[in-house]
Amino acid sequence: MPEDTSYSNSFEDYYNNSHAISPYKDSFYKEMTPSKPNVRFGDDDVNIFDQRKKVNEINKNNTVKRSIPSSISTTITPNKSSLKSPRGKRASKNSFDNETKLESKNETLKEVNDAVNRCYALCNIPTKHVSINSISDLAQTFETLAVGITHETNRKAECERSKNAIDSLYYHEQLEKKELNEKSLQMAIDHLLKVTKQNLRQADDGNKLKETEALKSFIEEIEEVDDNKISINSLQQQLLEEKTANNILRRDYYKLQERGRRLCHEFQELQDDYSKQMKQKEYEVQKLKNEIKVLLNMNDNLKAEKAHYSQKEKQYFQKYTYIEKYMNHVKEEYNRKEDECKKLNFIIDKSMKKIEHLERSLQTQFTAQNSFSTAMIQEEGPKDAHLKDRYHKVKEFMEQKLQTSKINDPSCSEAEALDNVLCLIESSMKTLDKNSKCYPIATKKCIKYVTDSPRLKENEHVTN
């Protein structure tokens, strides 16, 4: 993958200046970084702190411990003047340089890890929760990530240089060891032990003490060779762990880069959608403004019409009040006239009934009088031979008048009808008595015969 060097100048300024502020220590990313974020790339669940476990162990185990072989007696104290040999100076200088480089690497690795963790956390934001502010923050984060990637690339180059230096040191140490003959080394060690024992027994001999000091210096040189070998092994182990950490970081970097491409694509789509939505919103806002103007004009017109109609309403209300009062007065007059009309109608109906009753009575009386006068029995002699026949004629006349009376006046009872018929007969008889006084006996006999009939006996009050 090609290396992005667009932000290499910022890293070089930070790396060359020991008092510069790290571009990765941004308070914004500390606030955005959760306590333990989990990032999903495809089908892999990546836990940041689990992936960085080995890297943190490397940071804790960076110092190289120098130990004294157990074969050498601790009672022998080396002379400080013997450590000033050229070989000892070179070894101590190389060790100091290595420790300085390791400390610098530790700080750089820690800052890169912090930057990667922050990028992991920001990449874990769901797309549906991404807003315009978070997109701009994410763009700024990718800029910082690019700086961190450049920093990581330079750190890898520095690790390669350290590896080459370690390999060179190990090669020179091997050459120095090859110069020593194993047999002579064993003889020297045996001689050293022998002389040491003699020096312990004979401490007053000055020449032996000088020889002992020389042997001590020789032992210290051998110890330095062993310590250098231990340091080389430690550095090799550290280099292997750093390679493992670099592989992890490289894999995470590729995943972050792919995630960044997707987010950039989504960011571009969101920008396009946002632009379209803003244009649509502006169009809708302008449309609403125009509608508001039209509505305001309509509102003004409605207010003017409302004032005009209010004035008309007052006028109509005054007219309505006057009309209502007049209608109430007319209604009262109408009710009064209606009551008077009802009274008059009642009187008229009553009078009409009386008139009709009188007319019917008069007509009946007149008809009965005429009929009875024609049906009256004339006396043929001293004997009443035809009295029974005349009685039947009178009886038929009375029944006919009774039926006529019931038809003309249905409300009239049978007793009243009989009373009316008898009154007619009586009046007719009186008229006959006045006009023809020569027939009083025959008339009395006829009336007596009629009143003795069974029909009249049923109505005793009429007979009485």
Curated annotation (Swiss-Prot):
Residues 99-119, 156-193, 231-365 form a coiled coil. Its main location: membrane. GO terms for cellular component: cytoplasm; meiotic spindle pole body; prospore membrane; spindle pole; spindle pole body. It comes from Saccharomyces cerevisiae (strain ATCC 204508 / S288c). One of its GO terms (biological process) is vesicle docking. This is Meiotic plaque component protein 54. It comes from the Eukaryota. Interacts directly with SPO21/MPC70, NUD1, SPO74 and SPC42. Probable component of a spindle pole body (SPB) complex composed of ADY3, SSP1, DON1, MPC54, SPO21/MPC70, NUD1 and CNM67. The keyword Cell division applies. Residues 71-102 are annotated as: Disordered. Keywords: Cell cycle, Cell division, Coiled coil, Cytoplasm, Cytoskeleton, Meiosis, Membrane, Sporulation. It is found in: Prospore membrane; Cytoplasm, Cytoskeleton, Microtubule organizing center, Spindle pole body; Cytoplasm, Cytoskeleton, Spindle pole. Involved in the pathway that organizes the shaping and sizing of the prospore membrane (PSM) during sporulation. One of its GO terms (molecular function) is structural molecule activity.
